[in-house]
Amino acid sequence: MSEDKLQKLQDSGLVDWAVFSEIVTMDEDEEGFSKSLVEVFVSQVEETFEEIDKYLKEKNLEKLSSSGHFLKGSAAALGLTKISNQCERIQNYGHKINFDNFQLEDIKTKGDSAVSAENVAVNDGETNPENGSNGNETSNNKTNTSNIPDESSDDFWIALIEDALAKARDGFDQSRRALDEYYE
């Protein structure tokens, strides 16, 4: 393993190096061991993301929580913190626990269709680069079409889970590319 690849993976911020390096040391006893663990994880993630998509359509919060818990543990065992953190959100939101006080900014429903990631805007403290706003200001020019469900609504929790899932997928894609480079 080249030092450059090792350093690049460490610098990526995608991996808790203390955890991942323990797994890599097992390659000394069995060549390719860590890579095989990553390959199994990739398969698990792909299957579980499909299950999560199904449970989102069904609005099955219990199964969503269980799937989030499963992936959280698998990701954490490999030191894949970005994925693990988002899966922890899925797990907690499935139990209707907003442990990180995540706020929905706005949900616009399309007719009778279920809330989906395409029509959810969330406020996670980021500012709009176009106008510098953080999305909390109200405009006198637009009508208030806000349809933000409260925490008693399953749609609220589904929207939070969809946000966490989108971020978990992004973290997975980034981690997969970084690990593919590492193992080349």
Curated annotation (Swiss-Prot):
Keywords of this entry: Cytoplasm, Nucleus, Phosphoprotein, Stress response, Two-component regulatory system
Domain HPt residue range list: 30-125
Cellular component per GO, a single term: cytosol
Primary site of residence: cytoplasm
BP-aspect Gene Ontology terms: osmosensory signaling via phosphorelay pathway; phosphorelay signal transduction system; regulation of cellular response to oxidative stress
Region feature (Disordered): 120-152
SUPFAM superfamilies: Histidine-containing phosphotransfer domain, HPT domain
Origin superkingdom: Eukaryota
InterPro entries according to UniProt: AHP1-5/YPD1 (IPR045871), HPT_dom_sf (IPR036641), Sig_transdc_His_kin_Hpt_dom (IPR008207)
CDD domains in alphabetical order: HPT
KW Nucleus (keyword) present: yes
Residue ranges with Low complexity bias: 125-147
Purpose of the protein: Phosphorelay intermediate protein that is part of the bifurcated SLN1-YPD1-SKN7/SSK1 two-component regulatory system, which controls activity of the HOG1 pathway and gene expression in response to oxidative stress and probably to changes in the osmolarity of the extracellular environment. Catalyzes the phosphoryl group transfer from the membrane-bound histidine kinase SLN1 to two distinct response regulators SSK1 and SKN7.
Name of the featured protein: Phosphorelay intermediate protein YPD1
Species this protein is from: Candida albicans (strain SC5314 / ATCC MYA-2876) (Yeast)
This protein's encoding gene: YPD1
